[in-house]
Every structure is written in structure tokens, then in C-alpha cells.
Design a protein with these regions (language model features):
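Noncatalytic carbohydrate-binding groove/subsite architecture in carbohydrate-active enzymes
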Residues: 2-139
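Aromatic-rich peripheral "rim/lid" segments of glycoside hydrolase catalytic domains that contact
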Residues: 137-181
């Protein structure tokens, strides 16, 4: 149903602005083998979504990815705290989670022939939501943002990076997330 609803929205947007880009939004849970109404794996959803859209006529959709750190409360995504967290973030298409450390997993996956656009191009990828807590200091938060930007800028298939918040959200501070810059 989602793919069909997406196509309807896509067609409505394109009818008003032929140059608009329309994205499917996915979070950092790439391949955790979840199957419930409350959670899904981004890779499984992407596979099914693409399969349905191709079968019914390929359109030019893109991916809006949210590569938050694991756990969300740890800003140093390049240096995960425990073996457990490190086991979730691998340089493999079978990784459980995708953060900025391994964001290339998504862009590499989209280079597969079945995901290419009708013109043979890799689909647009934007990092439409990410952020790092300042709970460990603003210098650590700034380093995380700068490093994330460096990774994004050096991946030719990432078209944009958007930070989650300009100011801290009161509801998130209690959870250890001070994502405002």
C-alpha cells in the first residue's frame, strides 16, 4: 500500500513541479530482522518498495536517510562505546544499523542495477535528519557534525545533509538528547 500511496503523492507533486524530487524516508535500522507493525527494516522496505514501483512503471524517487548514531545518546559515531554497538554498525550490506560511519552501505546498495533510475543513474540520497547530542560537550557535538559533513561531502551520491534541530527539544533532553546546535 505504501508504494502505491507514494506513487500517488509523487504524481501529484510532479504535476505541480516537474523538477521536484520526492523521497522515501528511512531510519538507521537497516537490517535488524524486524517484522511487526511497529517496526521495519529499512533495507527490506526499500527492496519491496523498489520492486513494486519498478513492476508498475519506474519513477524517479530518492532516499531520505536518517543515519543517527548508535545509541542516539552517543555523539562519537566514529568510536562506538561497546562491542555490542560495534556489532550493529558494520561495513556490510547486512549491517544492522547505518550511521555516518557506514552510510556508504546505503549509497552502495542503491548502485545495484535494480535500483537505478530509468536513465541508469543512482538515485538521489539526502540525509534529511541527523544530529548529535551536546551532552558530552559542544566541542564533541561540533566535531561530530563536522565529521558527518566531511563524510557526506566525499560521497558523490549524497546530495544534502540536514541537521535535526537548531534548538534542544525539552522532551528529548530528559532522554539524554540535546540535539540543538
Amino acid at each position: 500500500e505504501y508504494a502505491r500511496a507514494f506513487r500517488t503523492v509523487y504524481n501529484a507533486i510532479k504535476s505541480m513541479n516537474a523538477n521536484a524530487r520526492v523521497y522515501i524516508s528511512l531510519d538507521q535500522q537497516w537490517n535488524r530482522n524486524r517484522s511487526s507493525k511497529e517496526a521495519y527494516d529499512a533495507r527490506d522496505l526499500l527492496d519491496e518498495f523498489n520492486s513494486i514501483l519498478r513492476a508498475e512503471g519506474n519513477i524517479d524517487w530518492g532516499v531520505a536517510y536518517h543515519p543517527y548514531s548508535v545509541p542516539l545518546t552517543w555523539p562519537k559515531f566514529w568510536s562506538l562505546q561497546t562491542d555490542f554497538y560495534r556489532s550493529l554498525v558494520l561495513d556490510s550490506p547486512d549491517t544492522s544499523m547505518v550511521t555516518m560511519t557506514n552510510i556508504h552501505v546505503v549509497t552502495d546498495y542503491l548502485q545495484r542495477s535494480q535500483f537505478l533510475t530509468s536513465s541508469g543513474q543512482v538515485r538521489s540520497v539526502i540525509l534529511s535528519e541527523l544530529g548529535y547530542t551536546s551532552s558530552y560537550g559542544e566541542d564533541v557535538q561540533a566535531a561530530a557534525i563536522a565529521y558527518a559533513y566531511l563524510i557526506a561531502a566525499n560521497n558523490q551520491h549524497i546530495d544534502a545533509m540536514v541537521l535535526s534541530r537548531q534548538t534542544d527539544a525539552v522532551s528529548e533532553i530528559a532522554e539524554g538528547l540535546a540535539l540543538g546546535i
